[in-house]
Amino acid sequence: MEKVAIVTIESLNYGNRLQNYALQEVLKSMGYVVRTVHRIYEPKTVKIYVKRMVQNVLQTKAAKFRKFDKKIEFSNVVLKRDEYPIGLEDGFNYFIVGSDQVWNPHYDFVAGKCDFLTFARNNQKISYAASFGVNEIPYERKFEFAEYLKNFKAISVREKQGARIVEELVQRNATVVLDPTLLLDENEWKQVEKKTVCCPKK
């Protein structure tokens, strides 16, 4: 069976965890062995550092997210924004980045080398519902983004504006797709809800 690695934002955020889980389940239903790559974020601004301190205080919330994370099958590999282990590309057939704001140029913990899968071979690089989170890429980063994007085997994005950005930068048509959470049906989510204690109460 072919192996697929998901590269996404890993944080204490309901939407992030749910989209990660949904993409995993969809790929598994297609017959792939799926693993999500662990991420480590190094604080680069005081704002992010303080945010993390607050998150660490919220131990109950963190514990609940860890319980939900047991539903996500992680690899033993750890990525930083611009650092990755040598030979990572040999462990998987494909790498899929998305479906969060992994390409947001204003977030200094993403939109780095790992989020553009620079460690992988060109025929391994795929994005699913990736988001830029902006209407336009800052001028000073356009060349960088173009160099990264032109090497992808397939590009799909979450918003129409994202498709326009891709067309502007690399003259390619990016497919606008659904968020993976919308690919699971109602019964599948009800089963998740029954087994999960971290979801907010109604």
Name these PLM-found stretches.
Residues 82-89, 109, 129-201:
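A nucleotide-sugar donor-handling region in carbohydrate enzymes
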Residues 54-61, 194-202:
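A polyampholytic, Gly/Pro-enriched intrinsically disordered region
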Residues 4-14, 18-147:
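Aromatic- and Gly/Pro-rich donor/ligand-binding loops
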Residues 3-7, 199-202:
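Short hydrophobic beta-strand segments
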